[in-house]
Amino acid sequence: MSIRRPQIPRLLLQNVSCMRNAQQILRHVNVSLHDGGALVLTGTNGSGKSTFLRMLAGFSKPSAGEILWNGHDITQSGIFQQYKLQLNWISLKDAIKERFTVLDNVQWFELLENKIGKAQPALELMGLGRLVKEKSRMLSMGQRKRLQLARLLAIDRPIWLLDEPSVALDDEGVRLLEYIIAEHRKKGGIVIVATHLPIDIEDAMILRLPPRFPRKMTLIDMLDRADIS
């Protein structure tokens, strides 16, 4: 009888720490994600949610520990070139080209990826089908977020890194976001979300990052502390 070896996690963080401006942001974080897995990062502003995602995207390196993809350290140049092709990133900077139409904004990224034909269906799914010929500068904040999500669907990479993806979305938009995350995971995709807003992701691991920066003192605080006689 053969013994089945445990499957290697697709993504593995081992004792990962991170410094920013000489201050410890993340300390000894351990996370493993297999195909279809999801991780939700929560915490106050300044707790390191975006820093965590930036490390996973390879924009910065951990000060200690390792981030492994398929068992290989992503900071190794040869590995990183393969790893970055697995990533799809959404941040608060939407990278929307104002002079392009809604459709062109998605098709432009399709051309870069050599993936054609998914732009229109993705926009339809995200409720932007009637706006495909509109200039992107005319979109509301919620519609811009939907456009980002449509681009995510059209490019269709296996690992999604989503920084505050539900910001500016109405209730219907949040439900669509939850739906496309669920569908992506059914196909074996991995989703990592940083958020301070409620979002329903079934069986997701929750990692709450503790606050790292003291709250700025307000005028009321100063008056309370002042020794006024």
Curated annotation (Swiss-Prot):
Gene: ABCI1
UniProt organism field: Arabidopsis thaliana
Family to which the UniProt record says this protein belongs: Belongs to the ABC transporter superfamily. ABCI family.
PROSITE patterns reported in the protein's UniProt record: ABC_TRANSPORTER_2, CCMA
Binding-site positions, ATP: 43-50
SUPFAM superfamilies found in the cross-reference section: P-loop containing nucleoside triphosphate hydrolases
InterPro entries, A to Z: AAA+_ATPase, ABC_transporter-like_ATP-bd, ABC_transptr_haem_export_CcmA, P-loop_NTPase
Top EC class, one word: translocase
Localization annotation: Membrane
GO molecular function ontology, one term from the record: ABC-type heme transporter activity
EC numbers on record: 7.6.2.5
Residues in the signal sequence: none
Keywords: ATP-binding, Cytochrome c-type biogenesis, Hydrolase, Membrane, Nucleotide-binding, Translocase, Transport
Single biological process term from Gene Ontology: cytochrome complex assembly
Main subcellular localisation: membrane
Reactions accelerated catalytically: heme b(in) + ATP + H2O = heme b(out) + ADP + phosphate + H(+)
Membrane topology summary: Peripheral membrane protein
Cited Pfam families: ABC_tran (PF00005)
One Gene Ontology term, aspect cellular component: membrane
Protein name from the UniProt record: ABC transporter I family member 1
Entry function: Part of the ABC transporter complex CcmAB involved in the biogenesis of c-type cytochromes; once thought to export heme, this seems not to be the case, but its exact role is uncertain. Responsible for energy coupling to the transport system.
Domain of life: Eukaryota
NCBIfam families given in the database record: ccmA
Residue ranges constituting the ABC transporter domain according to the UniProt record: 11-228
